[in-house]
Amino acid sequence: MTGVDDISSNVHKLVGVTAGMNTAASTGPMNLVLDKCSVVLEELRTIQILTETHSEGLSEQLKMTEKNILEMENLFDQIDQLCLFVQKAKSDLDKLEKLYNVVDRQ
């Protein structure tokens, strides 16, 4: 039964420390640990906020990059169409020039 008594005693001491029922001398190390934990918790919260803000900014940049890539793809498609048009126009112009030369010779 000593194990149960030890656990019960430890639980009572813990409740006494957290409830402030013990003297300040006995809670000094616990207060130090709690203070350090509070500081670390605040730092972690700050890091969380900064990370969330940074990730939102990255998300917006990613959306803009995707939009720019789509615009570039459309631009390349239009360039390809323009090349085809120029080739066809050059071919038509060559044919007209040959026809003109034939008619001019007659």
Curated annotation (Swiss-Prot):
Transmembrane segments: none annotated. The gene is blos-4. GO terms for biological process: endosomal transport; positive regulation of gut granule assembly. GO terms for cellular component: BLOC complex; BLOC-1 complex. Residues 53-106 form a coiled coil. It comes from Caenorhabditis elegans. Component of the biogenesis of lysosome-related organelles complex-1 (BLOC-1) composed at least of blos-1, blos-2, blos-4, dsbn-1, glo-2, mutd-1 and snpn-1. Interacts with glo-2. This is Biogenesis of lysosome-related organelles complex 1 subunit 4. The keyword Coiled coil applies. Component of the biogenesis of lysosome-related organelles complex-1 (BLOC-1) involved in gut granule biogenesis. Keywords: Coiled coil. Belongs to the BLOC1S4 family.
